[in-house]
Amino acid sequence: MMSSLSVEGMLLKSARESCLPARVNQRRNGDLRRLNHHRQSSFVRCLTPARVSRPELRSSGLTPPRAVLNPVSPPVTTAKKRVFTFGKGRSEGNRDMKSLLGGKGANLAEMSSIGLSVPPGLTISTEACEEYQQNGKSLPPGLWDEISEGLDYVQKEMSASLGDPSKPLPLSVRSGAAISMPGMMDTVLNLGLNDEVVAGLAGKSGARFAYDSYRRFLDMFGNVVMGIPHSLFDEKLEQMKAEKGIHLDTDLTAADLKDLVEKYKNVYVEAKGEKFPTDPKKQLELAVNAVFDSWDSPRANKYRSINQITGLKGTAVNIQSMVFGNMGNTSGTGVLFTRNPSTGEKKLYGEFLINAQGEDVVAGIRTPEDLGTMETCMPDAYKELVENCEILEGHYKDMMDIEFTVQENRLWMLQCRTGKRTGKGAVRIAVDMVNEWLIDTRTAIKRVETQHLDQLLHPQFEDPSAYKSHVVATGLPASPGAAVGQVCFSAEDAETWHAQGKSAILVRTETSPEDVGGMHAAAGILTARGGMTSHAAVVARGWGKCCVSGCADIRVNDDMKIFTIGDRVIKEGDWLSLNGTTGEVILGKQLLAPPAMSNDLEIFMSWADQARRLKVMANADTPNDALTARNNGAQGIGLCRTEHMFFASDERIKAVRKMIMAVTPEQRKVALDLLLPYQRSDFEGIFRAMDGLPVTIRLLDPPLHEFLPEGDLEHIVNELAVDTGMSADEIYSKIENLSEVNPMLGFRGCRLGISYPELTEMQVRAIFQAAVSMTNQGVTVIPEIMVPLVGTPQELRHQISVIRGVAANVFAEMGVTLEYKVGTMIEIPRAALIAEEIGKEADFFSFGTNDLTQMTFGYSRDDVGKFLQIYLAQGILQHDPFEVIDQKGVGQLIKMATEKGRAANPNLKVGICGEHGGEPSSVAFFDGVGLDYVSCSPFRVPIARLAAAQVIV
């Protein structure tokens, strides 16, 4: 092949070598064996326009090649191609083809292309999966022929054949969607074995290895393809170990394993009424079908729902020649991250098992050893692994999750993908990689997910030293953070308890992908088996869920719903605390403390703030809330709900009730005079906390009945009689007058202030007295008064008149004049429709998206739970509209009102103050329609800041 390139091949030698990765060039002289098969593919890539342009070649004095490429690698048209091969330094795909090849397939192709040792294989595309689903869950026409053609390539590369006892070719069959879904879809290893093939394999590689591989295949194929519970195979294994008096699988002899194979084959007959299929080609077809089927499995669907993964065509299928980590003490398998996924520390973080296969580590079947043990027992393979990690991290410019196998001291790379990480890890990795000049700040902003920040805002233990006497066990610190909850033993119970508002600690011997719903619902996860890279650990870290894994001291009894630690018994419902940072298991409920911003997070958030256009405010009702908001980076208060201040003490609520029960304006004014100093004091505290930043104060909004006592009517009357000094008859009459059929659409918002102007007057007087008082103390106060529930311009005009009159009086009395704004909440659809009229009166609009959603859909927030889950399950709604803004309906009202309002008033400030202001996809929409700010709860402020930046980058 190379001779056909002759002259141009010699001329382009320097260009070819310059295209090799830097680390590969460094290793060239020391490892020619690994580079020989790499050179041809590197040569082809160097001639590809995407890699080296023609102008670059001309500038070097070299002539661009022409038809010379055809003998090396024929052009590939991917329009209808469904099977792509890779391995031995060449591939038909690359990392940019994730949507077609899935993440695993695209990265296998890429690793092959950059010269790493990847076992040859083929990838069946995600489009083929989509066709499979559309074809009644059967392989579409022609696909099997394409698979067979790809298999021929693998057989030629490996000089072996599927099903040939003299030259056996065991295969792995793995799933791989475009977005990583750890453990959610299926894998089959050692495919192609039967009695004849395993005998041939035994002759070549030893009987113990061959029959160990065979029993693993029978177990995995039976579970994944035939639907036989793994526990039925595990029972046979545990029974045999008990009979032999051994504890480890590795202590079983070849004869033991051969006997175990027969027991496993009997499981097929007992469980399914049919024998294990011995035809390797049939095994492959069934395995491909099973992987395609796993795309639509309940656990995969639930994982996609939890993580809001949509728009994917399906999973790819990766069929790859097997390499074996279970061929004795010179073999092994491992999983690693190029940096610590929990902390972000720049240090290899992983685990390794000698004489084992990959699923033993990933599935948590055996608790592995630290990666450092590999350096001692396999130094050459370890050195090469470290070099490969440097190559991959430099190539992808990200922290990578890598699976590898060592077969008789030779390293093979089985998978690489962008590594899942905790919030803490994500931020540190992003900051470090910017400092290392690997990425720029805009890339860093894209690398950290909003969910990562959510994790960082979770509490930690208040005083770890205080609970040391209650630590009963220590496992592996698989996912950091603190969790406190009641012990439960099934995923179903965890989901049920979560729905009931209970905090659950899910305790399992080991988690499986079927547990994904319960893992998401639980406050924390504790497992007896599994390492730092087990299913439980990887999934928990991705969600920021506290997890302690591999806690060997605990014994879990699911049937009795208990677990034991020595003589101690912990029952279902007992309180337990977990420290995912240290791995400690602690009895009882331990106190939690709010989180604090790290230096890395402050640096990262400063980049986000520089990038974003949208301002981020906070909804805060007390001075403490305001201080928290400011510490979290809020640029002001977008919603201060005055009514929340009324519940701060018994004296305040009693004064409110006197105001509500008042019969005459004079009585009402007496009660309001009692409330004024309370409101003024709170406003002073908020203005002080927000020195130099705007504070938007909403006038009283909720229906008055919300301030009355709860309980039966007699209790309410008695309590009000004590609070107000009124007679029972007077109170009964007043309560009857306050009663409403639909209070949320009744006597509330600006309707209160118009009916009782003295109510608006009291609140506004308190606001401006506090503003002037703080100004006199050197605080810069920027007050904004918001009138709620406006549906007509006349309503707003009325309240503005009252507000401006009170402001003028206060300024005259106190001798100070301040600038201020008066605006309104747009929460009634009619207000959005006539926004140009309202905009003429207002200084600002703030969309109250909670009520606007309620009134636009006609859904009562208090009752929507009765049918919302049904709507979501049936696809009638894609999201809860009270969490994610409805862009087609409510969103269009917001867009229209913004445009109309600004047409009437070009200086109109526009924002939103519903909880949608902290939801990332909603923030992106608000930025797109040109709002000036969003306002959300104090703890969601960093999330909104990042979401607003990610829209820009």
From Swiss-Prot:
Formation of phosphoenolpyruvate, which is the primary acceptor of CO(2) in C4 and some Crassulacean acid metabolism plants. The active site is at H535, C913. Residues 55-74 are annotated as: Disordered. This is Pyruvate, phosphate dikinase, chloroplastic. Keywords: ATP-binding, Chloroplast, Kinase, Magnesium, Metal-binding, Nucleotide-binding, Phosphoprotein, Photosynthesis, Plastid, Transferase, Transit peptide. Belongs to the PEP-utilizing enzyme family. The modification Phosphothreonine is found at T533. It holds the Pfam family PEP-utilizers. Loss of activity below 10 degrees Celsius. Its cofactor is Mg(2+). Its EC number is 2.7.9.1. It comes from Flaveria bidentis (Coastal plain yellowtops). Mg(2+) binds at E827, D851. It catalyses: pyruvate + phosphate + ATP = phosphoenolpyruvate + AMP + diphosphate + H(+). Residues 1-77 form a transit peptide. Pathway: Photosynthesis; C4 acid pathway.
